[in-house]
């Protein structure tokens, strides 16, 4: 059946502290005394500016190249300010591999969750796609990926072709997540549960479109699963979580 981690460590990069606090409080309340939840900081090493610049994706097929000095400097400034550059896409699995190298090796039994503003992509069908979450060690949730990853309603792309993207945002603002969306902390809770189920069972997703473990590919699916569904977890996963908690008690 699996087992819950004894400890969950949350990291934030470029996101407001209240985002991490919201996940912290939620998991603390959800899991009770069986799991310790705490916050930490990713301590980057001296390689970071070059490594991060070298992980930039240059094209739809995952093209990369030797970084320019200016790109390395931009990454260095971003690390100093704890504010990653906007609009840059990174190779998601390679980014995860680098972050993994910064974590203590003895902590693999713990669940590490990094919430970042970086745009992360992975290859599927020969094309790189922006991801909302990457599941592994550590698990990484991208707030920018939550906004840019799941496809927006078809109406959005029609407005974009007509040059009226801002008009669409004004009319249909509740149908898609936006950067700095006040609903993001609530959405992050559901994605943190996906990371939890991945760590505990190896199976983070659910086919029930109303379950917060549903793997949404469209914004309206994400909005429904995380914000509008009459229930948080489907009966199957609600019962599974209770069983996992008993095993941790």
Residue positions per predicted region:
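Metalloprotease/metallohydrolase-associated module, dominated by Zn2+-dependent proteases
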Residues: 9, 14, 132-183, 200-249
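A contiguous catalytic/ligand-binding core that recognizes phosphate-bearing ligands
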Residues: 104-106, 116-144, 148-149
């Amino acid at each position: 059946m699996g087992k819950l981690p004894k400890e969950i460590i949350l990291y934030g990069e470029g996101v407001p502290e209240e985002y991490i606090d919201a996940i912290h409080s939620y998991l603390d309340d959800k899991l009770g005394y069986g799991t310790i939840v705490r916050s930490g900081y990713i301590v980057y090493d001296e390689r970071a500016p070059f490594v991060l610049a070298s992980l930039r994706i240059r094209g739809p097929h995952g093209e990369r190249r030797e970084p320019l000095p200016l790109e390395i400097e931009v990454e260095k400034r971003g690390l100093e300010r704890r504010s990653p550059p906007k609009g840059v896409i990174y190779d998601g699995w390679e980014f995860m591999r680098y972050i993994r190298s910064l974590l203590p090796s003895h902590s693999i039994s713990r669940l590490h969750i990094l919430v970042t503003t970086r745009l992360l992509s992975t290859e599927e069908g020969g094309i790189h796609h922006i991801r909302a979450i990457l599941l592994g060690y550590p698990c990484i949730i991208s707030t920018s990926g939550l906004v840019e990853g799941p496809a927006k309603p078809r109406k959005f792309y029609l407005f974009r072709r007509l040059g009226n993207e801002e008009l669409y945002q004004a009319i249909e603002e509740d149908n898609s997540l936006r950067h700095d969306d006040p609903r993001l902390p609530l959405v992050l809770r559901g994605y943190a549960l996906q990371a939890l189920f991945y760590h505990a069972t190896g199976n983070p997703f659910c086919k029930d479109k109303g379950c917060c473990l549903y793997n949404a590919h469209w914004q309206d699916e994400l909005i429904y699963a995380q914000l509008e569904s009459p229930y948080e977890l489907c009966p199957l996963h609600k019962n599974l979580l209770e069983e996992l908690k008993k095993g941790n008690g």
